[in-house]
Amino acid sequence: MIERIWSGESPLWRLLLPLSWLYGLVSGLIRLCYKLGLKRAWRAPVPVVVVGNLTAGGNGKTPVVIWLVEQLQQRGVRVGVVSRGYGGKAESYPLLLSDDTTTAQAGDEPVLIYQRTGAPVAVSPVRSDAVKAILTQHPDMQIIVTDDGLQHYRLARDVEVVVIDGVRRFGNGWWLPAGPMRERAGRLKTVDTVIVNGGVPRSGEIPMHLAPGQAVNLRTGTRCDIAKLTHVVAMAGIGHPPRFFATLKMCGVNPEKCVPLADHQSLTHSDVCALLNSGQTLVMTEKDAVKCRAFAEDNWWYLPVDARFAGHEPEQLLAKLISLASGE
């Protein structure tokens, strides 16, 4: 229902307009206060890169963060990652992730980023505290990437990168809750880089797509061609589950059942087992896998995806970040 409202297909969005106006007024005033200096942002002693969204829901932001971190690491840059830690609840903040940190403590995305990149990752509702935690433990850090946080103006940033779903784009264009917007589309004029996931990019936007890899078994780490799996039940607890289901079909998999879950939904062994009948194979997103690996069964698999770019624009972005990290 919410997708139909945000896309404008349902007229119910009009009933939510008063709340959207209030949301837009409050968020606009907050940004204006920081812009005019009425509120002061904390500036880190190293460059900060924000990778965020203008809309709620899945846009492909986390794969972009992972790509960015890996590319910087390959070029010898010491990079850390901070996040709000949505869906997690730590005993205390800031929380610096370790191999023992769970998604219940830190949230899905931070654990996924930590496991994929090995970079120092810290979470806190106050992102500046997360940055300080990383710099205390890793004083030689050269640059910080913040996963989400475009609207977290308490943390000063040197580069802003926005990721857009190229198919859904901005829906009906209204602020939450009548539409999907955290900020209006005009905000794009003030950011450094706009990356478009799928669809047709517009002038000045960098095209990107998510490329699936081989299926990975949660228990053994064994890899295989996803199309070889049979009697598949697909599960996705991400911002936009239909994208994952469409990816499976593109890979030649026709699931017997598709189960969309809420983003950041907690899962137990019994919850997941209840989705399957005897002889069926479960395929989930990598983001779900970080929650399920501890209690996985032999027939549970996940499909990793990686951000892929074409053209010279990504190299220009990386060159800019390397220059900042080097203090040039």
Swiss-Prot record:
Keywords: ATP-binding, Kinase, Lipid A biosynthesis, Lipid biosynthesis, Lipid metabolism, Nucleotide-binding, Transferase. GO terms for biological process: lipid A biosynthetic process; lipopolysaccharide core region biosynthetic process. It comes from the Bacteria. This is Tetraacyldisaccharide 4'-kinase. One of its GO terms (molecular function) is tetraacyldisaccharide 4'-kinase activity. The keyword Cytoplasm does not apply. ATP binds at residues 55-62. GO terms for cellular component: plasma membrane. Belongs to the LpxK family. Its EC number is 2.7.1.130. It holds the Pfam family LpxK. The keyword Mitochondrion does not apply. Pathway: Glycolipid biosynthesis; lipid IV(A) biosynthesis; lipid IV(A) from (3R)-3-hydroxytetradecanoyl-[acyl-carrier-protein] and UDP-N-acetyl-alpha-D-glucosamine: step 6/6. PANTHER family: TETRAACYLDISACCHARIDE 4'-KINASE, TETRAACYLDISACCHARIDE 4'-KINASE, MITOCHONDRIAL-RELATED. It catalyses: a lipid A disaccharide + ATP = a lipid IVA + ADP + H(+). Transfers the gamma-phosphate of ATP to the 4'-position of a tetraacyldisaccharide 1-phosphate intermediate (termed DS-1-P) to form tetraacyldisaccharide 1,4'-bis-phosphate (lipid IVA).
